[in-house]
Amino acid sequence: MLPLAKNALSRLQVRSIQQVVARQSHQKRAPSFHDKYGNAILAGGAIFCVSTWTYTATQIGIEWNMSPVGRVTPKEWRDQ
């Protein structure tokens, strides 16, 4: 492409982008779903996960395979 044509096209693109940005900045934007409810949904999900894991860890009797160090004593060797 000729340098003159390149320059003209790049200016057209920049100008159209600037016009779009100017139009968007003058309009009042209504809050989206995420703006309205995002933090409440995030907090609710976090509370649900923490409460579910707390119940699971404390109430349903899972054997967690804790370390036997200090609870298991070795048997004496038998001489044969």
Curated annotation (Swiss-Prot):
Keywords: Membrane, Mitochondrion, Mitochondrion inner membrane, Transit peptide, Transmembrane, Transmembrane helix. It comes from Mus musculus (Mouse). Component of the cytochrome c oxidase, the last enzyme in the mitochondrial electron transport chain which drives oxidative phosphorylation. The respiratory chain contains 3 multisubunit complexes succinate dehydrogenase (complex II, CII), ubiquinol-cytochrome c oxidoreductase (cytochrome b-c1 complex, complex III, CIII) and cytochrome c oxidase (complex IV, CIV), that cooperate to transfer electrons derived from NADH and succinate to molecular oxygen, creating an electrochemical gradient over the inner membrane that drives transmembrane transport and the ATP synthase. It comes from the Eukaryota. The keyword Mitochondrion applies. Residues 61-80 are mitochondrial intermembrane. Component of the cytochrome c oxidase (complex IV, CIV), a multisubunit enzyme composed of 14 subunits. The complex is composed of a catalytic core of 3 subunits MT-CO1, MT-CO2 and MT-CO3, encoded in the mitochondrial DNA, and 11 supernumerary subunits COX4I, COX5A, COX5B, COX6A, COX6B, COX6C, COX7A, COX7B, COX7C, COX8 and NDUFA4, which are encoded in the nuclear genome. Belongs to the cytochrome c oxidase VIIb family. This is Cytochrome c oxidase subunit 7B, mitochondrial. PANTHER family: CYTOCHROME C OXIDASE SUBUNIT 7B, MITOCHONDRIAL (PTHR16716:SF0). GO terms for cellular component: mitochondrial inner membrane; mitochondrion; respiratory chain complex IV. It is a single-pass membrane protein. Residues 1-24 form a transit peptide. It is found in: Mitochondrion inner membrane.
